[in-house]
From Swiss-Prot:
Protein name in the entry: 3-isopropylmalate dehydratase large subunit
Keyword field: 4Fe-4S, Amino-acid biosynthesis, Branched-chain amino acid biosynthesis, Iron, Iron-sulfur, Leucine biosynthesis, Lyase, Metal-binding
A Pfam entry, by short name: Aconitase
Gene that this polypeptide is encoded by: leuC
Sites where the protein binds [4Fe-4S] cluster: 303, 363, 366
Superkingdom field: Bacteria
Organism taxonomic ancestry: Bacteria, Bacillati, Bacillota, Bacillota incertae sedis, Caldicellulosiruptorales
Leading EC class: lyase
Natural source organism: Caldicellulosiruptor bescii (strain ATCC BAA-1888 / DSM 6725 / KCTC 15123 / Z-1320)
């Protein structure tokens, strides 16, 4: 009889062909998907070519998504994308997504059904942890490991300890998944889950949509975590059946599995939360912000909050209102399909009428890449995941993080505020 294991331990053990793994074990495991983007894949390609083989391990289990500097922002990014494009063509990579069919990688892969419960996914991007929302073990790696995995289908792992988050209660008002994860990071700190698995369970999951869960899992790395993972429930299965035909395997933590820490969180008590510069742990609830913080730019989108539910909330708030004069509001649907759905539901017209600019799917300003760089001294409120010094532009600029609801309301107000200041209650239709 094996010892009790957490969700992450079970997935790693299964893919390593072992009955049991424990925290600290170094293992080699078979991966179900290897992911890269236009920034990390060129380095991986160079390393892959040094190996001297003429094929990848499985052309169906590699996904390459140019999303960071696309559409090409300059000659260097154009050259990188060309290299990636040629590699994908040479090795007949099935899941290469060109401009026009692409999206931000961590929104695109679940939408395309490429990740299902029980999968082991690695990606040369730190926010690969997003897929834990589906009950998969997913984590970021470097380009060298990506190269080796493309060649062998394997990667090495150090089995992480786990922190258990038991969620109960229901979301209230304008609170969203973004507020829950900002609350958690504010509570444990940016290194509070260092190299650990953040595992979510409890009856509070019923109150969280899949988009909420993607947001929460996405920001596990902002707490230093190896991965974030949700217990699979009916909502997970419904989502997977809508998007994928791949077989899946559900791994449930044993009742007596060991955790380094256990937190019980009543999500009904969490209020809309804002992370102040220059760390995601510098959080205040909207009620604790006593001064008016005037902002120059609002960004709604990214792999954290660019999904249809996020745009729906933003449109609800911006409908019939105008962006404050002198403020820039940029909206990035996370994928082409999300863009199409937003068009169908009339959101794009609402955004344009409000004075926003709507962009093609791209990581763009989140990493200070393009499409909305901040100047010296400017302040931005963004639904992205990081607010480090210089993250979105000039080293003297400042980035605040929030949910789409707070971001949209702030775009109208001109300062960081809530939809409640516009006379809107969270349960309004």
């Amino acid at each position: 009889m094996t010892k009790p294991m957490t969700m992450s331990q079970k997935i790693l053990a299964y893919h390593a062909g072992k009955e049991y793994v424990e925290p600290g074990d170094l293992i080699f495991a078979n991966v179900d998907l290897v992911l890269g983007n236009d920034v990390t894949t060129p380095v991986a390609i160079k390393e892959f070519e040094k190996i001297g083989i003429d094929r990848v391990f499985d052309k169906d289990k590699i996904a390459i998504v140019p999303d960071h500097f696309t559409p090409n922002k300059d000659i260097k990014s154009a050259q990188q994308c060309k290299m990636v494009r040629e590699f994908a063509k040479k090795y007949e990579i099935t899941n290469y997504f060109e401009v026009g069919e692409m999206g931000i990688e961590h929104a695109l892969l679940p939408e395309k059904g490429l990740v299902v419960p029980g999968d082991l996914v690695i990606g040369a991007d730190s926010h690969t942890c997003t897929y834990g929302a589906l009950g998969a073990f997913s984590t970021g790696i470097g380009s060298t490991d990506m190269a080796c995995a493309m060649a062998t289908g394997k990667c090495w792992f150090k089995v992480p300890e786990a922190i258990k988050f038991i969620l109960y209660g229901k979301k209230t008002g304008w609170t969203s998944g973004k507020d829950i994860i900002l609350h958690i990071i504010g509570m444990i700190g940016v290194d509070g889950a260092l190299y650990k698995s953040m595992e979510y369970t409890g009856e509070g999951l019923k109150s969280l949509s899949m988009d909420d869960r993607f947001t929460i899992a996405n920001m596990a790395i902002e707490a230093g975590a190896k991965n974030g993972i949700f217990e699979v429930d009916e909502k997970t299965i419904e989502y997977v059946k809508q998007h994928s035909t791949k077989p899946y395997k559900i791994f449930k933590a044993d009742e007596d599995a060991e955790y380094s820490q256990v937190f019980e969180i009543d999500i009904s008590k969490i209020r809309p939360t804002v992370a102040f510069p220059h760390l995601p742990e510098n959080t205040k609830t909207i009620d604790e912000i006593t001064e008016k913080i005037y902002i120059d730019q609002v960004v709604i989108g990214s792999c954290t909050n660019g999904r249809i539910e996020d745009l729906r909330i933003a449109a609800k708030i911006l409908k019939g209102r105008k962006v404050k004069k002198g403020l820039r509001c940029i909206i990035f649907p996370a994928t082409q399909n999300i863009y199409k759905q937003a068009l169908k539901e009339g959101f794009i017209e609402i955004f344009i009428d409000a004075g926003c600019v709507v962009s093609t799917p791209t990581c763009g300003p989140c990493l200070g890449g393009h499409m909305g760089i901040l100047a010296d001294g400017e302040k931005a409120l963004a639904t992205t995941n990081r607010n480090f010094v210089g993250r979105m532009g000039h080293p003297n600029s400042e980035v605040y993080l929030s949910s789409p609801a707070i971001a949209a309301a702030s775009a109208v107000l001109g300062y960081i505020g809530s939809p409640e200041e516009l006379g809107m209650k969270g349960d309004e239709e």
